[in-house]
Structures are given as structure tokens and as C-alpha cells.
Amino acid sequence: MDDYRYRDNYEGYAPSDGYYRSNEQNQEEDAQSDVTEGHDEEDEIYEGEYQGIPHPDDVKSKQTKMAPSRADGLGGQADLMAERMEDEEELAHQYETIIDECGHGRFQWTLFFVLGLALMADGVEIFVVSFALPSAEKDMCLSSSKKGMLGLIVYLGMMAGAFILGGLADKLGRKKVLSMSLAINASFASLSSFVQGYGAFLFCRLISGIGIGGSLPIVFAYFSEFLSREKRGEHLSWLGIFWMTGGIYASAMAWSIIPHYGWGFSMGTNYHFHSWRVFVIVCALPATVSMVALKFMPESPRFLLEMGKHDEAWMILKQVHDTNMRAKGTPEKVFTVSHIKTPKQMDEFIEIQSSTGTWYQRWLVRFMTIFKQVWDNALYCVMGPYRMNTLILAVVWFTMALSYYGLTVWFPDMIRYFQDEEYKSKMKVFFGEHVHGATINFTMENQIHQHGKLVNDKFIKMYFKHVLFEDTFFDKCYFEDVTSTDTYFKNCTIESTTFYNTDLYKHKFINCRFINSTFLEQKEGCHMDFEEDNDFLIYLVSFLGSLSVLPGNIISALLMDRIGRLKMIGGSMLISAVCCFFLFFGNSESAMIGWQCLFCGTSIAAWNALDVITVELYPTNQRATAFGILNGLCKFGAILGNTIFASFVGITKVVPILLAAASLVGGGLIALRLPETREQVLM
């Protein structure tokens, strides 16, 4: 088996380590053994010397001789690191000059829309499951715990994808890993619309979340490396508009597709493709279109230069220059750059020979090598010279996510709560009624019947909705083709009564006494209650919430390079905290919608500034990795926020409001300890 070799990220191993040791030592030992032949006893021959075992004194002397060589190796390593840092600093300033020469024009705007679609796919993913659930729960007969897991699994997938794919983008390239990310999302999101079982649907949404989770870190790192210092803050903020567009797109598609139950088909009695599945496929379109368009875009030249690929990077920069100059009407302008500084390479992967081991072993070695490189890179972000910036950013990302995602879930839940309270206030109560020989074939809704007596009554082809029969006596009654939602019989006596083709299952009769009563041919299917109302208001709330961030996006884009990143983060988070206190006055649906729009509109500026400063604080070989770590932590904060805030709906508004406000104030003040990056070149 041929030997395979790879050089470590930081080349910290001396040549004398086990993987690089040669046979010279054995040859010396054999020679030493030969020399001792024929010596007399006065030579103090060491026992075992004839077996080639070196004397302890010889070992000590060898170690003494090797110590300087190890020190030289470490010194050379330090010199190499210092030289590389000088090269990177020189490259950063030279690259800034080159990007200025290339100009900002058609190429950047084309890339802007391609990457914007990828960011839009991330925004869509947040809403897909929540919009599809009211219809999907009926098809899959989902309990509350299963619905909660579906909402959770998307964030878990996005968290894992941000960690993994963000790290890979710093090793394999922005374009390659982003294409992989979008392909995973598009394929598994589409597949999830066809699968019938809950487990398969859950798995597909998990993998889809992993795919799209890597898009946001890569998109911002990728686009920033084509922007000059003067344009970076503004245009990265403009890019954030596409995340808002994703929410608008998902809301509009849900509004226009899901209520149309005829938009589907059935194959036999077991396979049903309903309108919510059409909605899931439509939501995969942004990722699909972005993936196809990305094929025509080049790799980041800044990344290629970091990898030592000078010629390829030069060709791409020339393409950027020529594209922009042609669009400006000056095609004769020549790209004057002939040579670009490339950093000293310290990380090299040597391809394994095809004759080395089996295909499985070769791929395993490749995987372990890449994994080690990504892991070391992540540790360098957390424990290296950037650890303090990473810690501060982690706190800011987490507090922002906890409050923002927590409140964006709390708003629609509170609106539902207000709807339920209003509905309950209109409930009709019938006490001691006596009905004899009646035929009832209309809908009974939102009623309570107590201590009544129904004799020889027929309930035919009717619908019970939120109806409670309590301490009621049924005698010689007949129920046929009856459907129900949230309907129960409590402490009732049911005598000589027949139930034919109904969904009044046994769990709907609580402490009831049956006398000579029969159940015939009960309805098949799910035995759970689901609301029949469409979620028009929830779609509208999400639509308005997404649309409300547009003014904040525009303002943050125009002011990002004027007032700086830190003032934008701190100011936006503090203003958002003040807006939280207005929620105490949100005692109706319309008021809650208005305060939601205000909160989303003020907080978006902090998100945009966070994206920009995260990109600018880290060098090229750690940029996507650090962004992925922080974005993964953001999704963890979103999970906690959703769980904590939802648990207080209908109980108290004080805890969610104070928690959100405190998180925003704390995060905004801590963010001021970060360095300002407005005048900084990309390292």
C-alpha cells in the first residue's frame, strides 16, 4: 500500500515524528552492532547491543543533538507564520486597490440577485413548516408534540448546517459549498412534499434545514469579497432585503395556494397530494433557481488567492473588470494588474494515489483530513486571537435571536389567543332544555348544553363545533353522518341510542353511562380534532411583519457606511427594546399587529449591521467558519426564544416583554465593545 501524506494546517509536527520517520535509525543501529564484533571484555559491551538495541547513553546523546533541530523547526514555523501574516496584510491592501480598479457595476449586481435568491430561500425556510402545519396535521394526524418537533427540527437542521457548511466554505470554496447547500435544500424540500409518513417528512425537513443553514454564512462571505470598502456596508445591507422577500414570498404563496383544496390529486385511497404539498414545492423554487444561476458565477478570487491559486484568481478579477467596463461603455479600458501577492501556503492536501487502499479507505482519509482542517479552523476562531471578538459577537447574536425569534412567534400566538377569547365570549349556554322528536341537520357551534333531556331526536348529516353536552340525558336518539371538532359528552346518560357513521369516538365521552346503545361503522381516519378555519389572518400577520422591515432595511443600507456598524447595532437594539414596552398596550389583534410591525422594522437594522461586522472582523480563511458558528448559535437562541415565549401565551405578558427588552439592552451595550470596521479592509 502506497504511503499517503498530508501536511497539517499549521505544520506543527517535526520531521522526526512517527509518520515521517525513516529507516536511517535502524541502519545506524546495525552498523553499531557490527563494530562491536571482536572486542574483548574490557570494552564494556552493553548487553543486547548485538541485537541492535542502543545504549541508554547513546539515546541521551541523540536526544541532546535532536533538541536544537526541533527548536530550529519551531523557529522556522514561527518565521513562516510571521511571513504569512505579512503576506496577508499586503494582499488585503492590494486586493482593495484591485477591487477599486474593477469598479462596482453589472457583475456585482448580477451576483447580488443570484445570492439574493439563496438568501431568500433561507427566509422562506423559516415559514414553510408553520404555514403548512394546519393542513399537514390532518393528513398526517399529528399530535401537539409531533407538531412541536416539526417546528424544532428545522432550526436544528439550520444550526447544524451553519456550523458544518460554513466551515467547509473556508476550505473547499464559497461557490462549491453554496451550490452543495442549495442542492441539498432544494432536493429534500421537494421530496418532503411527496412523502406520506411523519417520520419521512421530519427527516426531509431536517436535511433541508441543514442545506439551507449553510447558505446565509456563505452568501455574505462570498458577496463581501467582490465589494470595495466604500460599498461593502451598504450593499451587504441591500442584500438583506432578500431575506425579507423570502418571508413575503412564503406568506403570499401560502395565502394563494393552501386554501385551494382542489389543487391536488389522489392515487387510490392511501396517497393524497393536497394543496399544502403544492405550497411546499413552490417554496423550494428560490433555492433551485439560485443553484442553477450560481453555475454561471465564478469562485471568490479572494478565496482563491488565499489558497495560492494566483492565475485563476487573476482571470476572475479580469472578468469582473471587463464586465463592468463594458457595461459602463468603456470596453477599451485595460485591466492593469499583472501580479497579485499570494500568502505563503501552510496548508496543503496531497491527493492519495488510486492504488492506495480501497475506495472506502481513501474517502475516509479525505473526510478525516477535511474534518480536522475545519475543526482546527473553528477552534482558531474561538480560542485564537479573535476569541474576544467571537465571544462578544456570540452574546450579541444570541440575545438578538432570543428576543427577535421569541417575539415573532409570540405575536401570532397572542393573536390566536385574542381570537379564542373573543370566540369564547360569544358562547351560548342552554340549561335544562327538553327536546322531543326533533330532526337536527344544521351546524351546532360554540354551545354548552347542561342538564337537558333529548328524547327520540335525530342528528343527521350535521356538524358539531366546540359543543359540550354536560349532565344531559339522551333517550332513543339517532346520530348519522355526524362530524365534530372539539365536541365532548360529559357525565351524560345515553340510553337506547344508535351512532352510525360518526366520528364521535369513545374518548369524546367522559364519565358517560351507556344503556343499550350501539356504535355502527364509525368514520375511519385520524381520531384527533383539528380546526377547520383557514389561517388567513396568520398569513396576513406574517406578510405584514415581513413587509414592515423594508423601511428599516432601506435606512440601514443608506446609513451603514455613514454612522458605522457599532452605532447601528447599539441604536437599533436599544430602540427595539423601547418598542417592546409598547406591547403592554397590545390588547387587541390590530394593536398587536401594529406593534409587531414596529418591532420588526426597528430591529432589522441591527441584523444587517451584525451581518456586516461579522464578515469584516475575520480574515478570509476564517470568515465563513466564524459566521457559521455565530449563525448556528443564533438558531439555538431562536429555539430557546420560541420555547420560552410560547409558554407564557395566555398567562402573562410581563415575562416575555421584560425578557426581550433586557436581552436587547444587554446585547446592544455589549456590542459597543467591538472594534469599528467601517474603514477596515478585508483581511
From Swiss-Prot:
Modifications the protein undergoes after translation, according to the UniProt entry: N-glycosylated. The N-terminal cytoplasmic domain is phosphorylated by CK1.
Tissue: Expressed in ribbon synapses of the retina (at protein level). Expressed in diaphragm motor nerve terminals (at protein level). Expressed in hippocampus neurons (at protein level).
Residues with Phosphoserine modification: 33
Membrane-crossing segments per the record: 111-131, 149-169, 183-203, 206-226, 238-258, 278-298, 391-411, 536-556, 566-586, 593-613, 627-649, 654-672
A Pfam family it matches: LD_SV2
Localisation: Cytoplasmic vesicle, Secretory vesicle, Synaptic vesicle membrane; Cytoplasmic vesicle, Secretory vesicle, Acrosome
Summary of the knockout phenotype: Mice display no particular phenotype. Single knockout mice survive significantly longer than wild-type mice upon exposure to C.botulinum neurotoxin type A (BoNT/A, botA). Mice lacking both Sv2a and Sv2b experience severe epileptic seizures and die immediately or shortly after birth similarly to mice lacking only Sv2a. Single knockout mice bind reduced amounts of BoNT/A than wild-type mice. Single knockout mice are significantly more resistant to C.botulinum neurotoxin type E (BoNT/E) than wild-type mice.
Coiled-coil stretches noted in the UniProt entry, renumbered to this chain: none
Homology family: Belongs to the major facilitator superfamily.
Description of how the protein assembles with itself and partners: Interacts with SYT1 in a calcium-independent manner. Forms a complex with SYT1, syntaxin-1 and SNAP25.
Protein name: Synaptic vesicle glycoprotein 2B
Organism (species): Mus musculus
Gene designation per UniProt: Sv2b
